[in-house]
Structures are given as structure tokens and as C-alpha cells.
Amino acid sequence: MKMLKLLWSLLAVAAVLPGVAKEYRVSLPEVAAALRQAGPGDRIVVEEGDYRDLELKWRGRGAEGAPLRIEAATPGGVKIGGSSSLRLAGQWLEIAGFDFRGGTAPKGAVVEFRCGQEVADDCRLTDCVIDGYNPVRRDMAYSYVILYGRRNRVDHCTFSGKLNLGVTLIVMLNEERSQQNFHRIDHNHFAPRPVYGSNGAETIRVGTSQQAYRSSNTLIEENLFERCDGEVEVVSIKSSDNIIRRNIFFESQGVLALRHGDRNLVEENIFIGNGVRNTGGIRIVNAGHRVVRNTLVGIVGERFFSALAVMNAVPNSLPNRYCLVEDVEIADNLFVDCSNIEFGTGKDLERTLAPERVVFERNTIVNRALTEPFIAVDRTDGFAFRDNKVALGAKCKLEGFKNVVPMLPSLPSEAEMRAGRGAARYRSQCGTQTPAPRTHVLRSGDDLPAAVERAGAGDTVVLADAGGDYPVSRAMTVRVPLTIRAAGEGARPVVRFVGEKGDNMVTIADGGELRIEGIAFSGVLEPGKALAKVGISTAENMIRPYDLFVDNCEFADFGEGGFFAIKGTQSTFAGRVEIRNSLFRNLSGDAIHYAAERDDKGRYNADDMLIENCSFFRILGLPINIYRGGSDESTAGPYVFVRRCNFEDCCNKERGSVMRLVGPQVLAVEGCNFSDSGRGGCSIRLDEATWEKVSIADCNLWNSGRILSMTGNAVKGPLCELEPAYVDPDNFDFTQRPGSPLAEKQIGTKK
């Protein structure tokens, strides 16, 4: 007992002696004041709670071996939301256990390693979560974390739910005091990020083209990049002397890009594609790099998304274009079932310089679907091939390659990938249970917008009366995944607009996904009422991507030129749009309009588009209008497929187009019939690059405009000029009569 009292006395004395670590228990807004008193080795413990609308500015100084630590009382127990951000500056600060969830950054990044003009050195952000910290619009750009200063560390953090423009984590080299920084970015989990649809959605960027030849000395290791699909560059290195090692890239639609800068080391990383579209590996630009001992499995991306892409260069290139690849070592790497290893990637009339002095040695390439180990886009006399092993679908006879039966690697499971990476406590909320789907049955005259607003995720709204009248005075706003359909196969229920103020008939808002079947949308102006703006459109401010499926619907009698049947608005993005078996007739505006991004910076409104077995009749605007302007190469979409559609008396004005397709990177127009359409201009106006995969085949052009292609190489199959023989055009049945020439050729709509 005496010994216990003595121990307590000694502890009490130690608590007030100089140099002994202290603990401060405070609320989140009180941290800044506590920092003015705290010193090396002290702990500031923040009470649990939900904190909102705080611009936190933390300055303090610890010491080597005795950092000043600011931590949540319970990891994850301090939740920071609303309009909040964190700025930290000083030296030897350690921030641990905080969760930023569901908020937005008021200005700049969510977390920055600087406060005003003062930067942070030797500071650490650990065991933190930033999840769903997005603005209201996806084109409002900011990052989750920006590193300034030197020798800072970001580790064991989880970064999730980023939907807006902007790099997730940036290493800045804009000043000398942030160069040669020796930052560490390790053991983090970069959780799924969907395709953004333009440049500027990288997961990590180190430097910029202006600092390409400055040494950063940043170490990126032991991170998990899981389905980071924002753009082609998952990790974008734009500086020199960095190390990227032992990371896992899991089903990420993009690459580790050595975009600018020299002498970077890429070693012992694992890339797992599992055959997912656009999964990529390593892209090389500039000089002096080493790419060694990496494992790439099931990577199927092409061109800039290849498993390995060694780029061609621009003569006398400016730093922000493509400098010569030279003096590069690519050794001891394993490629299993990877579809594209490319040398001379990007060769065109600008990028004309092939790589020089590249050593490709002791690599192993296994893919029984290939007959050659690599694709030579340009000459390869600048490569030295030595001691490589291959197991292909045919015997390889190239010098420097030996046919063998190799040992295949064992890959980590998803649980093993996540172990030790990210905040240990973090569990995505994606798996939370939702109520069982319900069906809402509506009769003619019922309040359809109100029913849609009441519906929960996965519900179905059924319009029960065949040919029934369903007037709407405001938009049906879809905020959850929802199906709206007719009850049966009789006459389509008719939705018509009777509002006092113009509005959409259906608006897909944040969180919404729509499947709509068997509905007719009438744009006829009701006496004393306003016109509908669009049949189906999107909210002006959206952050989340959405899907839209339209089947067996009719859009008719929209009588104003700016009023469209289906439209994606600016700064909204659809992952998938499918429009099948539908009729568009008597429209003054466009029928299908995904052309709102007009800044020519590579942005577009929908990634995958399928338009199949649809009829278009008497369309004054463009039946199909899809736009991706500019020459940006950081995305893979849009993918556009138009199959078995019929166009009768469409867009015959001077310089008009039935289809205007600007910048689709994958396009197939097949089995379509153009009749008395595009006479004043084009049936198809296509603006494509030489490397984009476009195909127009098996189409009929009867008394219709020509096909105008930028490259002149878009037509890949036969075209014909046969007069259509429709089943019942007076009742808008534009299928070909059985036995007619076009029916035999399977051109035009089908039953």
C-alpha cells in the first residue's frame, strides 16, 4: 500500500516537471488553443462527437522522437462534416484517428500541409478517413490532401467516395522548400473512384510539368489502389527521383504514369486487372527510369492504358508534352495474360521520335492468346532485348526472347490486399441494408411526381391503366434507383406536362438511377400551360454518376427547338445509358442529346451509350447528338453503339446531321436505315481521331446525306441505297416488310 501511494506521488510530481509529456483533453474547436501551450511529446486528445463547419488551423512544434500528437479519443469517434477543412503547419505534428465524412471543403483541399504561408515539415497524418467529401457540382475541383514542406508522411489512411474533379492526393513542388521533400505516402487504401469523364481525376500526382526536372524524392509504397478509375493516370509522376514500390493496383482503369521527370524507380508493384476493361499498368515518358520486378496479371487496356506503354516523343518537346524516352531499364517484370505491351505508343504526326537506349531484359511474358510478345507501333531499334522468357500461342522467334514454361505467381486475396492498408477501423457503408423493394400502383390522374418522391431505393412505380392519362405539373424527381413502367403490353400510358412553369417531365437527381419501360411522353402544349423542357433529363447540380435505361417508350410532339426528348445536362455524368425499342417523332429539338460539355477539354456526359432498335420520324433537330470535344487523351470514353435504328425524314436542314458524333473513342453504327434524312448535310457527321476505334457498317442511305468522317476511314462495312418498305408507317411502324431487301439484310428496326 505504501509503495502504491509513493508511485502516485511520483506521478503527480512528474506531471508538473518541465519536459514531461502532458495530455490535454479538449473539444475539436479547442485544439488550436491547446497547441499554443503544448510542446514535444504532448498529446492533445479530442473528445468524441460530430463536428461541423470548422476551418481548423493547427500550428505546433514537436521534436524528433517526441512528436506533438493530436488524436481522436477513439479512432473514428471524431467525425468532421459540413463545410470543414484542416490546415497544419510547424514541425513534428502527428494527426491521428479523425474521420472527415460527407462534408465539403470550403476552400482548397480538405487537408493541407500548410497554414497560410507556413508549411509543415516532419508531420504525419495517420489512421484518418476522408470519405464522400464532395461539393454539390462534380466540376468544382479540389483535392482531399495536398502535401507541402518536407519529410511529411501520410499513412494508414482511407480515401473514399471522391466524385468531383481534382486529384485525390497531391505532392506540391511549387517552392524550393517543398522540393527534395522525401515525403512518404504508405499503407493507405485508395478506395474506388468512378470514371470522371475528363482529365484531372488522378488519385496521386507528384509535381507538375513545370517542376518535371526538380527532384521530389517522394516515396509511394505499400498502398492499395482499388478500382481507381477516375482517369488514365491513377498515379501521375511529374517530377524526378521518386520511388513507387510494393503497391497493389486492383482492377483500376488506368496506369502508373511516369508522365514528366527523370530517374524514377518503379519496383515490386502488383497490378491485377482480372480482365476488366481499361485496366492498365505502367506508362513511360522521359529518361533514366528503372521499371523492375513488377507483376502484372490480367491487364487488358490498350494504348495509353496498356500493361506497359513506352511512349513516342515530340521533337524539341516542351516540358508539358512528350519528351524523349531514353536510358530506361525495364527488367525482371512478369506479365501474365496482359493484352498490350506497346513500344512507340502514341505515334502520330506530332509524336515522331521513337524511344532510344531502352534495355528490356529478363522479363517474362505469358499469354497463350498472343503470337508476339509486344506491339511495335514504331521502330524498335532503340531497344536492347536480352534474356526475356515467353509462353505465347505461337513460338517466338525474336532475338532476345526464349520460349519457356514459366512458373506463375500466386496473387494476394482481396482480404490480404486490404490487410495493413488504410484505417483499420474503416468499413465502407456501401453494404448497409436497404428496405425490401415495394411496388406503387397508380391509376390515371394520380399524382405521379408525389409517388416518385415517396418511392424508396429499388421500388417500382406501375402505371396501371393502358393508354391512361397521367398529367404532371412538375418534374418526377428520381433520387434513388427506381423503375417506372407500364402494367402490361397494351397502349402506352401517356405522361403529359400541365405545369404553370416549364420543367422536365423526369429529372434524375443525385443518387438517382432510372429504368423506364412502356411509357409515352407527350410534349403537346396544353392550353394556358407551359411547355415541358425535356422528357427525361438530369438535375443541374449533380455529383454522383447515374444510369438510365429506356425501353419501349415514345417521345412525341415536343414543339420547341431547345426542348429535347432525352438530355444529359452540363457537368452531369452517366455511367451507362441504354435506349431500346423506342419511338421518337415530331420533335423540333434533339431526340437524344448528350452534348452539353462544349469547352473542348475532353469532357463528356455519358461513358457507355447504347441506342438500339429505335425509330426516329420527323425530327427537326438532331436525332442523336453526342459530343466530346478537344484532343485530351486521359479518358477512354465515350463508348457509343447505335444498332438497327431507323431514321425517316430527319434533320433535312442545310448543314444538318442525323447523327452528330464528336469524339467517341469507341463507336459502332451498324444496321441503320437512313431514309429522306440529312439531305441538307450529313446522315452521319463524325469527328474522330486516327487512333479511335470507329466503325460504320451495313447501313442503308436512301435519298439521304453522306457520311462525313474526319479521317475518311470510318466506314468498315458495306453501305447500300435501297428504298425502304415499311410495315405501317402511318402508325409509326417502321420495321421492314418481311422479305423486303432491307429485311433480308437485317437493316433497320426489328420486331
What are these regions (language model features)?
Residues E55-K57, G82-R87, R101-D121, I130-G400, ...:
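Glycine- and acidic/polar-rich repeat regions and solenoidal domains
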Residues I375-F383, E399-T439, S444, L686-A689:
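C-terminal "tail" modules appended to repeat-scaffold proteins
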Residues M1-W8:
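Bacterial N-terminal signal peptides that target proteins for export
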Residues K22-Y24, V78, E233, R438-H440, ...:
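Structural signal for short hydrophobic segments within the conserved structured cores
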